[in-house]
């Protein structure tokens, strides 16, 4: 497990939004694409933030709620990133330390993807299934 890299566990298409998109657009795009977050890009395609279902949920319960509000007003700007060579172990530590579910994968200041807690869990499930099979095969060989 420690040797497995982020580049091997995150291979879904990365959907993005523009900072000028509305809350309504963000909500629709998250729903349509079955994702829990989307990075936000500026007019130069630079990542300037991230918005998640949690951000939208918090907004709905605030006095500022308005579906026409632009997402640059509510996006998280404190970006937590990793690179393609980050190990799964390092990624799990980062997610735990920062109490986050999504980490942006960046390489040379370019967005390469997003790795979610679900990606990590699926990786671990597959890892343990393989390990379980190997142990059963070993035991049954005697």
Locate the predicted segments by residue:
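A contiguous, well-structured "functional interface" segment within a domain
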Residues: 1-36, 139-141
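Tandem CBS (Bateman) regulatory domains
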Residues: 1-12, 52-81, 85-96, 117-142
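The conserved cystathionine-beta-synthase
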Residues: 17-34, 41-44, 81-99, 106, ...
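Acidic (E/D-rich), amphipathic helical modules within compact regulatory domains
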Residues: 28-62, 71
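Conserved beta-strand segments that form the floor/walls of ligand-binding pockets within enzyme
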Residues: 39, 104, 116
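Short hydrophobic beta-strand segments in globular cytosolic domains
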Residues: 47-48, 106, 111-112
């Amino acid at each position: 497990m420690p040797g497995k890299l982020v580049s091997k566990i995150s291979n879904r298409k990365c959907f993005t939004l523009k900072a000028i998109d509305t809350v309504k657009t963000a909500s629709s795009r998250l729903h349509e694409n079955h994702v829990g977050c989307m990075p936000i890009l500026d007019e130069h395609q630079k990542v300037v933030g991230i918005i998640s279902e949690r951000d939208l949920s918090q907004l709905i319960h605030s006095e500022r709620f308005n579906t026409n509000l632009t997402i640059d007003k509510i996006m998280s700007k404190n970006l937590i990133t990793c690179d393609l060579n980050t190990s799964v172990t390092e990624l799990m530590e980062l997610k735990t330390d920062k109490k986050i579910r999504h980490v942006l994968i960046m390489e040379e200041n370019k967005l390469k993807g997003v790795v979610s807690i679900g990606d990590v869990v699926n990786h671990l499930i597959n890892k343990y299934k393989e390990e379980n099979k190997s142990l059963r095969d070993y035991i049954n060989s005697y």
